[in-house]
Amino acid sequence: MAAVSLSVSTVKPLGDRIFVKVAESEERTAGGILLPDNAREKPQVGEVTAVGPGKLTEDGKRQPMDVKVGDKVLYSKYAGTEVKLAGEDYVLLSEKDILAIVG
């Protein structure tokens, strides 16, 4: 089996899937207390790095995607598949898991 080199630029989502770079989690509380890695909340915000072509409708046409590369999005807390590439955290989501475009 040949080795596959994965990088952000080689990830091309299929259908209505979206590849999102996860935002950094807060390291300190509002009161200034430093949080260890295992006590931090899982972020639900990230930047879209790749977008699939859209879902096929029953008549064979592609439904356009509501998000584009560069959008900052809010997504469901337990949605998607987590991926780590080059030391960065990403999540692969379905479009239905995106709750809002922010900023």
Curated annotation (Swiss-Prot):
**Protein location:** Cytoplasm
Tell whether Cytoplasm is among the UniProt keywords.
yes
Which Gene3D superfamilies does this UniProt record tie to the protein?
Answer: GroES chaperonin
Per UniProt, the keywords (alphabetical) are:
Chaperone, Cytoplasm
Q: Which Gene Ontology MF annotations are present?
A: ATP binding; metal ion binding; protein folding chaperone; protein-folding chaperone binding; unfolded protein binding
Does Iron show up as a keyword for this record? Answer: no
What the entry lists under InterPro entries is as follows: Chaperonin_GroES (IPR020818), Chaperonin_GroES_sf (IPR037124), Chaprnonin_Cpn10_CS (IPR018369), GroES-like_sf (IPR011032)
- Cellular component terms, GO, for this chain's entry? cytoplasm
Q: What is its main location?
A: cytoplasm
GO biological process annotations for this chain's record?
chaperone cofactor-dependent protein refolding
SMART domains the UniProt entry points to: Cpn10
Q: What job does the chain carry out?
A: Together with the chaperonin GroEL, plays an essential role in assisting protein folding. The GroEL-GroES system forms a nano-cage that allows encapsulation of the non-native substrate proteins and provides a physical environment optimized to promote and accelerate protein folding. GroES binds to the apical surface of the GroEL ring, thereby capping the opening of the GroEL channel.
Q: Can you state the subunit structure given in the record?
A: Heptamer of 7 subunits arranged in a ring. Interacts with the chaperonin GroEL.
Regarding protein family, the annotation reads: Belongs to the GroES chaperonin family.
Q: What is this protein called?
A: Co-chaperonin GroES
Could you tell me which species this protein originates from? Thermosynechococcus vestitus (strain NIES-2133 / IAM M-273 / BP-1)
Coding gene? groES
